[in-house]
């Protein structure tokens, strides 16, 4: 251990690192160099003084100097050593010293961040590497996941800033003097496509020739370039549509290797052109004479698709060559428009949504005698502990909903969700959150039905909302009240009188499948009227356990109560499918935690799995503690799909009967208004086939979607084209909604 480094550095536990490290990891450095040691980060920006309010999910994009202790891997002999690191944003350098006292001396090592790559490790939540353009590499380890996330975020912002400066400060090379209108002697001119192909992929040559005549780039020409980019991108979208709408088999099919390569190459070309256009803008801005007037803002002229090229509400429109083709025909279900469409977020108004009338009631599997041969064939290919992420499971075990919609169903009690922020004290708010958390699983898991939802396709999204009458949301009365307000709940929404929009709170929900391998989903919900939102990302890891299958929900969520300046970090339990050869059933298991670093309250929740002999099914216990005094303020016991008993520190008890708890129906857009990649429209053919008990037909539709996803993933890998998400942005190890409520509404702690 180096001098000047307090011993407390080595005492950070795993749980504290994950849940509590954030509040103390970042401190303002307004006065002097009083930096925290032992992995604590000192920041020169006053904005970081918010502490733990949103650091796990929000980072400002301004330049911020950071310094603090990190462990650096030296070599096999020496191993890991503590070193004091300084991020010099102005110079674009990452420097390190033996300890903080020697920071006034020459640094022991320096890395240029321009062109560098910052890579968090997949093996653990503490390690990351900084790979400089020169080939030099620093392998570093933070005290905990939150500290690593902060360092990675600051380094990435600094790297991006100085990398973009390269394009601005170094003008592009002079263009070569050759003419596109050459004689017919070049190899390209000799490879003329057939007339039929030209009519299929029509290109506006007259406009392209007009661009070739412009020898000099004047300021006004940036607008013209943008217009041409818009035109080219519109043609590329049309190309993708035409390829995807070809029949799946025949002389020219949508899965033809040459056409798939053409689609991927055109996508990569447009991405490259967008980057070049951005460099032109930077170059033009650097040549502007004189300083800009104060208050002037610069808006980049991003290429935009003309309105005529947009398809309203994402609905498919027939081509001019096929005017009588019905929208619902399988050939016209152009599902894989993912390349361009998935990159453009869409603001969906809750006014476009209607109360859900879809009845996807699930029947339990019961005995699986008829499917035993299918299951035995599958089991013969599996090994104990094998990862099932890439294993295709039989269709008959599927629910009629996507995993993304399952996450939405966890929000089916919006009155309890909104009521959290009504808690009068931090203790009351924590208890209300635990109550909401425990009551969410019975609807999210549809009781304990032994079926699994669809695995979402990458780029798949799901949108919905709930309207909750303000009169039905619990007031600020303490949750420890013995009045059975929840067991004698208000009537179900369909029985309640019609409420105007102004008399209701609106809870909006959006989910997106942001990664395929590993399968990661991001979801976000907010109630803007009450200034509260929840952001979460979940990686589902499934393993074969012999006669059962276990699914681990890796990831975490954060509930932000902006009215109180509080954040509640939580995790999710594991799920197990038992007795898969006889009568399958599902249970939840494992320990999860809820923590609020600001108030010092935490909750430990245990989902008990059934022992081999005796014991109850679906049992859950929980304790809510005040960490500063280690006092238990509430205990919970019961079954997560039946009855829960809350016992408070004053001796009072409350029972929550989940069978009597009202479920608010979600509001969704009609199917014809949904985008091609929204869950219900994407899986429509599979769902319809399952409703009709056409298992073979459902399997074929499901296989078609999965094969298309694999093909596109392979082509993206071959062409080096990264996947771009639509609504969520990767920050450190997590995924954050692109327009979270906390970015628009400042956190204002209550007096």
UniProtKB/Swiss-Prot annotation:
PH domain sequence ranges: 63-160
Residues modified to Phosphothreonine: 27
Superkingdom as given in the UniProt entry: Eukaryota
Modified residues (Phosphoserine): 15, 177, 179, 182, 186, 189, 194
Modified residues (N-acetylmethionine): 1
Single Gene Ontology BP annotation: lipid transport
PROSITE patterns (alphabetical): OSBP (PS01013), PH_DOMAIN (PS50003)
Subunit structure, as described in the record: Heterodimer with OSBPL9.
Family (UniProt): Belongs to the OSBP family.
UniProt name for this protein: Oxysterol-binding protein-related protein 11
């Amino acid at each position: 251990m180096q001098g000047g480094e307090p011993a407390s550095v080595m005492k950070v536990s795993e749980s504290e690192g994950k849940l509590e490290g954030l509040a103390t990891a970042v401190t303002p450095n307004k006065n002097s160099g009083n930096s925290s040691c032992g992995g604590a980060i000192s920041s020169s920006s006053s904005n970081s003084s918010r502490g733990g309010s949103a650091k796990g999910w929000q980072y400002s994009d301004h330049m911020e100097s950071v310094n603090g202790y990190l462990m650096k891997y030296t070599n096999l002999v020496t191993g890991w050593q503590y070193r004091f690191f300084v991020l010099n944003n102005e110079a674009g350098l990452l420097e390190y010293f033996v300890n903080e006292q020697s920071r006034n001396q020459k640094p022991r090592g320096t890395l240029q961040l321009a062109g560098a790559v910052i890579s968090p490790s997949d093996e653990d939540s503490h390690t990351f590497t900084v790979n400089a353009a020169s080939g030099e590499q620093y392998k570093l380890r933070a005290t905990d996941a939150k500290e690593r996330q902060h360092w990675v975020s600051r380094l990435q912002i600094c790297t991006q800033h100085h990398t973009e400066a390269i394009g601005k400060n170094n003008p592009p090379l002079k263009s070569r003097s050759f003419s596109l209108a050459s004689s017919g002697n070049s190899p390209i001119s000799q490879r003329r496509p057939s007339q039929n192909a030209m009519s299929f992929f029509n290109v506006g040559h007259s406009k392209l020739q007009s661009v070739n005549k412009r020898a000099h780039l004047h300021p006004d020409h940036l607008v013209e370039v943008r217009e041409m980019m818009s035109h080219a991108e519109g043609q590329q979208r049309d190309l993708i549509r035409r390829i995807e709408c070809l029949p799946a088999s025949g002389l020219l099919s949508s899965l033809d290797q040459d056409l798939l390569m053409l689609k991927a190459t055109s996508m990569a070309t447009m991405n490259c052109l967008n980057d070049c256009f951005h460099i032109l803008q930077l170059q033009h801005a650097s040549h502007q004479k004189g300083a800009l007037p104060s208050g002037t803002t610069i808006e980049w002229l991003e290429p935009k698709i003309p309105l005529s090229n947009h398809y309203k509400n994402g609905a498919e429109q027939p081509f001019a060559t096929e005017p009588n083709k019905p929208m619902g025909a399988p050939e016209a279900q152009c599902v894989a428009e993912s390349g361009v469409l998935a990159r453009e977020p869409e603001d969906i108004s809750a006014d476009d949504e209607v109360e859900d009338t879809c009845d996807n009631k699930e029947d339990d599997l019961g005995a699986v005698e008829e499917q035993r041969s299918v299951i035995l064939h599958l089991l013969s290919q599996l090994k104990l502990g094998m990862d099932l992420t890439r294993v295709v499971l039989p269709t008959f075990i599927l629910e009629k909903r996507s995993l993304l919609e399952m996450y939405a169903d966890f929000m089916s009690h919006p009155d309890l969700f909104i009521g959290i922020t009504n808690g009068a004290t931090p203790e009351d708010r924590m208890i209300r959150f635990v109550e909401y958390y425990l009551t969410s699983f019975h609807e999210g898991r549809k009781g304990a039905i032994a079926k699994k939802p669809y695995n979402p396709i990458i780029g798949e999204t799901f949108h919905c909302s709930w309207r909750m009458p303000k009169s039905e949301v619990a007031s600020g009365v303490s949750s420890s009240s013995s009045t059975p307000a929840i067991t004698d709940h208000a009537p179900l929404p369909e029985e309640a009188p019609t409420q105007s929009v102004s008399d209701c709170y609106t809870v909006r929900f959006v989910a997106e499948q942001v990664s395929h391998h590993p399968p990661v989903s991001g979801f976000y919900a907010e109630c803007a009227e009450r200034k509260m939102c929840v952001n979460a990302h979940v990686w589902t890891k499934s393993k074969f356990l012999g006669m059962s299958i276990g699914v681990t929900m890796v990831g975490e969520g954060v509930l932000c109560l902006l009215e109180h300046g509080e954040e509640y970090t939580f995790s999710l339990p594991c799920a197990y499918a038992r007795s898969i050869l006889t009568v399958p059933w599902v249970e939840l298991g494992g320990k999860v935690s809820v923590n609020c670093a600001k108030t010092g309250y935490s909750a430990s929740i245990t989902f008990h799995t059934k022992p081999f002999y005796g014991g109850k099914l679906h049992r859950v216990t929980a304790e809510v503690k005040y960490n500063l005094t280690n006092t238990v303020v509430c205990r919970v016991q019961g079954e997560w799909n039946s009855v829960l008993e809350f016992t408070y520190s004053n001796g009072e008890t409350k029972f929550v009967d989940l069978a009597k708890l009202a479920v608010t129906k979600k509001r969704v857009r009609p199917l014809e208004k949904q985008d091609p990649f929204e869950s219900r429209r994407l899986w429509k053919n599979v769902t319809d086939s399952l409703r009709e008990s056409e298992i073979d037909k459902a399997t074929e539709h499901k296989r078609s979607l999965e094969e298309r996803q694999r093909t596109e993933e392979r082509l993206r890998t071959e062409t080096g084209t990264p996947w771009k998400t639509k609504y969520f942005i990767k920050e450190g190890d997590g995924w954050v909604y692109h327009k979270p409520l906390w970015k628009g509404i400042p956190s204002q702690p209550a007096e």
